[in-house]
Amino acid sequence: MNAAERLWRGLARHDWEAVRAQFHPAAVIERAGDGAQLGVEEYLAEHRVAAGRGEEGEIEVLRSVVDGKAAVIEARVGERRCAGIYDLHDGRIAGAIEYWA
């Protein structure tokens, strides 16, 4: 299992320390829809708030594709979908872009 798959497993369990552990400290996560660029702590905070409000619902990974230093995850988050492209370096996520619909 790679860091992107562990990330989504942690998100599904609301295991915020496990989520944090998947990222390099300087990682930046871009949200393609609004152009937001989040640091790891901002990313965690957004997911914590959404989970606390019940906005995330059940999380299910539908597809995972890994090719060397990149991983692509398609996930269902409640009624929403996310496709994320994750750059992997030394077993952790160095950067990512997520597309939400």
Which residue stretches match the model-derived regions?
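A solvent-exposed, acidic/Ser-Thr-rich amphipathic alpha-helical stretch
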Residues: W16-A18, P25-V65
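Alpha-helical interaction segments
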Residues: E5-L7, R13, G33-Q37, H89-D90
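Short acidic-aromatic low-complexity motifs
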Residues: M1-A26
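A beta-strand edge to alpha-helix "cap/lid" segment located at domain peripheries
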Residues: A45-A101
